[in-house]
Amino acid sequence: MAVSTVFSTSSLMLALSRHSLLSPLLSVTSFRRFYRGDSPTDSQKDMIEIPLPPWQERTDESIETKRARLLYESRKRGMLENCILLSLFAKEHLQHMTEKQLNLYDRLINEPSNDWDIYYWATEAKPAPEIFENEVMALLRDFAKNKNKEQRLRAPDLEYLFEKPR
């Protein structure tokens, strides 16, 4: 009986010492990515901001190259919600966009550092910054409403790229 008491007491002390050693580290270290221009408030001084290079418009690529790049970037987002939303949007609208609209779409999907921002703006959960309030954002918001009640469970297959125009 005395041996089991010693082991349970020492186990408890070890667990408490681990907790007291790790809990300050866990409570201080947290990561958050900020939208460009945001900075941590006084209460967020312990957060780490990961600086990203500023977005720059690519002026040296052809329209077809830009369309292909934007199609790829619309499909490979890193979060499923935007992969589905943006890839289906790209399938429906990318081929018909003007050069100006392609540039606006490029800025929209590549300038924000947080993909959730794009999703919240498209679904109107949060207001978009003034710089992104344009005709492409209006198209994306309208598309996100899914007025035709289409089933959107995955990104589209790429066969449509090889179909001949009708």
From Swiss-Prot:
The keyword Transit peptide applies. Changing residue 78 to R: In PPGL2; abolishes interaction with SDHA and flavination of SDHA. Residues 1-29 form a transit peptide. It is found in: Mitochondrion matrix. Disulfide bonds: none annotated. Coiled coil: none annotated. The keyword Mitochondrion applies. Keywords: Chaperone, Disease variant, Mitochondrion, Transit peptide. Interacts with SDHA within the SDH catalytic dimer. Belongs to the SDHAF2 family. This is Succinate dehydrogenase assembly factor 2, mitochondrial. It comes from Homo sapiens. The lineage of its organism: Eukaryota, Metazoa, Chordata, Craniata, Vertebrata. The gene is SDHAF2.
